[in-house]
UniProtKB/Swiss-Prot annotation:
Name of the featured protein: Actin, muscle
Family: Belongs to the actin family.
Propeptide residues per the UniProt entry: 1-2
Keywords: Acetylation, ATP-binding, Cytoplasm, Cytoskeleton, Hydrolase, Muscle protein, Nucleotide-binding
Record EC number: 3.6.4.-
Top-rank EC class of the record's enzyme: hydrolase
Source organism (scientific name): Pisaster ochraceus
One Gene Ontology term, aspect cellular component: cytoskeleton
Keyword Aminoacyl-tRNA synthetase assigned: no
Function, as annotated: Actins are highly conserved proteins that are involved in various types of cell motility and are ubiquitously expressed in all eukaryotic cells.
Subcellular location: Cytoplasm, Cytoskeleton
A GO term, aspect molecular function: hydrolase activity
InterPro entries linked to this entry: Actin (IPR004000), Actin/actin-like_CS (IPR020902), Actin_CS (IPR004001), ATPase_NBD (IPR043129)
Positions where N-acetylaspartate occurs in the chain: D3
Length: 376
């Protein structure tokens, strides 16, 4: 079925960014925002070839006149028509391949609604005529990318965070925890606290500016209280940012108040545990004999784990929760923003994986529900 010479496609559809490329490559070929934009205004210049929707970078560059929508929220696809546009854009414009000629590996957050993967499967086979496909769990792929078979992965993207303990290659489903607190919530929170400084960001396009501020200037404080004191007594932590219109804004304690939400979700009114407690709780749900290995192999992955200082803070917080003599190691690979994709690239090019694909024939015989039987 799968010829050796046909490269599989690996598509990691995140809530914020879509990463796509070919299995066996060491980095994704295409990385673009998972955005579909529609014009807010009536077109007046006839013959300009205006489109009724724009995807990815093109939507981003024309954002001033568009309403931007993210079809994936909290890791779950909420708008399938837009999602189809994103996949179409991925195959035809970014990778320039015919999807009916390549097997496709897609990724998904754990504990997603079952209907979500079924619909993904259905669209791949019926709309794009894929010869074969597979849906893999994001965190498991990150562990592959770090070269381990045992560890606990804390994967945090734009829409959803989750901790997945894996022992000798087996995910432990009873101990998987999901946290609907991620990058997008931090962007929203930063929009809110910048309002206190007198800067108003309201539209979907302005939210993208705030996301950029967040990615460029925010960091995680090792000691939040101490950092707040430093910020109030001196201006050493202040940084300036130039807006697209040339106006310069100054941002101070917001730089670390924004990511602090990961450790104190109460900042945005969420009742859940912070990311350090969630990781700890996940480890505590595992068998007592394997906890030691999980503490020593805590892997961070995803774009929201890219804040400077987050690994040290995680180390400090988990050390405070764990038994005093426990060796704790937080692994934060520099390429962790793409580690899910890299893991997918590794998995899809393994010879042992080739019998795992769901083929078109199997789909035609069983329908979309086959995805639950063949994919973890």
């Amino acid at each position: 079925m799968c010829d050796e010479d046909v490269a599989a496609l690996v598509v990691d559809n995140g809530s914020g960014m879509c990463k796509a490329g070919f299995a066996g490559d060491d980095a994704p070929r295409a990385v673009f925002p998972s955005i579909v934009g529609r014009p807010r205004h009536q077109g007046v210049m006839v013959g300009m070839g205006q489109k009724d929707s724009y995807v990815g970078d093109e939507a981003q560059s024309k954002r001033g006149i568009l309403t931007l929508k993210y079809p994936i929220e909290h890791g779950i696809v909420t708008n399938w028509d837009d999602m189809e546009k994103i996949w179409h854009h991925t195959f035809y414009n970014e990778l320039r391949v015919a999807p009916e000629e390549h097997p496709v590996l897609l990724t998904e957050a754990p504990l997603n609604p079952k209907a979500n993967r079924e619909k993904m499967t259905q669209i791949m086979f019926e709309t794009f005529n894929s010869p074969a496909m597979y849906v893999a769990i994001q965190a498991v792929l990150s562990l592959y990318a770090s070269g381990r078979t045992t560890g606990i992965v804390f994967d945090t993207g734009d829409g959803v965070s989750h901790t997945v303990p894996i022992y000798e290659g087996y995910a432990l489903p009873h101990a998987i925890l999901r946290l609907d607190l991620a990058g997008r919530d931090l962007t929203d929170y930063l929009m809110k606290i910048l309002t206190e400084r007198g800067y108003s960001f309201t539209t979907t396009a302005e939210r993208e500016i705030v996301r950029d501020i967040k990615e460029k200037l925010c960091y995680t404080a090792l000691d939040f209280e101490q950092e707040m004191q430093t910020a109030s007594s001196s201006s050493s932590l202040e940084k300036s940012y130039e807006l697209p219109d040339g106006q310069v804004i100054t941002i101070g304690n917001e730089r670390f108040r924004c990511p602090e939400t990961l450790f104190q979700p109460a900042f945005i009114g969420m009742e859940s545990a912070g990311i350090h407690e969630t990781t700890y709780n996940s480890i505590m749900k595992c068998d007592i004999d394997i906890r030691k290995d999980l503490y020593a192999n805590t892997v961070l992955s995803g774009g929201t784990s890219m804040y400077p200082g987050i690994a040290d803070r995680m180390q400090k917080e988990i050390q405070a929760l764990a038994p005093p003599t426990m060796k704790i190691k937080i692994i934060a690979p520099p390429e962790r923003k793409y580690s899910v994709w890299i893991g997918g690239s590794i998995l899809a090019s393994l010879s042992t994986f080739q019998q795992m694909w769901i083929s078109k024939q199997e789909y035609d015989e069983s329908g979309p529900s086959i995805v639950h039987r063949k994919c973890f």
